Amino acid sequence: MMVCLVTDSRRLAAAGASFGARRACLAAQTRFAVDAGVDLIQLRERDLDAADLAVLAADLRAATRTTSTRFVVNDRLDVAIAAGADGVHLRGDSLPIGRARQIVPPGFLIGRSVHSVDETTAAAGADYLVAGTVFSSASKPGQTQWLGVEGLRAIVAAVPIPVLAIGGVAGERVGDVARAGAAGFAAIELFMGAHGGAELAGCRVVELRQTVKNARSRFDRLNTTP
């Protein structure tokens, strides 16, 4: 099972916090994620410019370099390569996967977001997919239609590579995506200060060891249940 944390440092710091404060909070949460054995961290800070994103990418590289946790950068292939990231996660409007493969080093991970079976064609050549939004999620407040378990199952059946579910995957829903054949799940809200995380130097950070342990246990148990 693969567990992927998708970042949003705005959830960790006080409203209107400076970039420096957000950086410090993300560094603290990253330490908890690595300690918990999170498999993959996706740096996704859509409101930041390339310069600030590069700073966070360098921090993540330093925090994960000697660990089993890998990290990828959302969309910005240039930032990912410059930081020595393990890979990039592409969106539908990102650089095509084939073009990206031409300029990345061997072993570089390329992930792709998909929202339907039809989109898997454009994702050919990816190492893994993130499929969603599966369930209602606070991270997508304006969305009214969801992929659902059957939509996730169809995407899993359509491709030969691992598929991670995203969107409202927590609690018993971990078992739902396991039974649909997903290789794991990705999440923002579950990992990024949304549950009244402890205040640590002004940051709402969450100690993740029990969260990750519970998710793995539930996924592995239900993945083998007929």
Please give the residue ranges for each predicted region.
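Short beta-strand-loop elements within alpha/beta enzyme cores
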Residues: 128, 132
